[in-house]
């Protein structure tokens, strides 16, 4: 019986020691915990604002779609796009503008118009050397809005 108690205490102390030793070791963070938000990988609000500024310039120069933006309050439009991208990518912004459906009602936006606008956005992303992975993630976030934008 005495031998059993010694053995029991030996095992108990060993388990505690191993447990403490394993707690003291640095555990490797998981890949998910390490991965920064898309907002951060895009460079934050300043970088998003720069891309949106270029995107709006691209749209203004694009004869396929620029007429659709006649009479639009461009500074307000830019702010809405920045906030939408910022919030959608995990940033601290809050999108407070009209819904996509309400914003595009009556504009008669076609699939060709939508495609042209996406091309203008991709051109802006490319100009700022946004990596393909981040571009794909952003377009995947914005893509579902197509149903509320395209009306014909």
Language-model regions, residue ranges each:
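Bacterial N-terminal signal peptides that target proteins for export
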Residues: 1-11
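C-terminal motif of bacterial Sec signal peptides marking the signal peptidase cleavage site
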Residues: 18-22
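Repetitive helical segments and hydrophobic/amphipathic motifs
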Residues: 14-15
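Core of compact, soluble alpha-helical bundle domains
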Residues: 24-152
């Amino acid at each position: 019986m005495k031998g059993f108690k010694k053995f029991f205490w030996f095992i108990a102390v060993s388990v505690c020691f191993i447990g403490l030793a394993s707690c003291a070791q640095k555990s490797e963070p998981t890949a998910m915990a390490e991965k920064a938000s898309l907002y951060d990988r895009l460079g934050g609000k300043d970088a998003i604002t720069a891309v949106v500024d270029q995107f709006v310039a691209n749209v203004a120069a694009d004869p396929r779609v620029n007429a659709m933006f006649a009479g639009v309050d461009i500074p307000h439009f830019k702010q809405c796009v920045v906030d939408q991208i910022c919030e959608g990518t995990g940033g601290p912004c809050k999108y407070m503008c009209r819904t996509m459906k309400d914003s595009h009602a009556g504009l008669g936006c076609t699939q060709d118009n939508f495609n042209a606008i996406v091309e203008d956005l991709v051109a802006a992303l490319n100009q700022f050397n946004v990596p393909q992975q981040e571009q794909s993630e952003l377009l995947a976030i914005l893509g579902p809005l197509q149903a509320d934008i395209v009306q014909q």
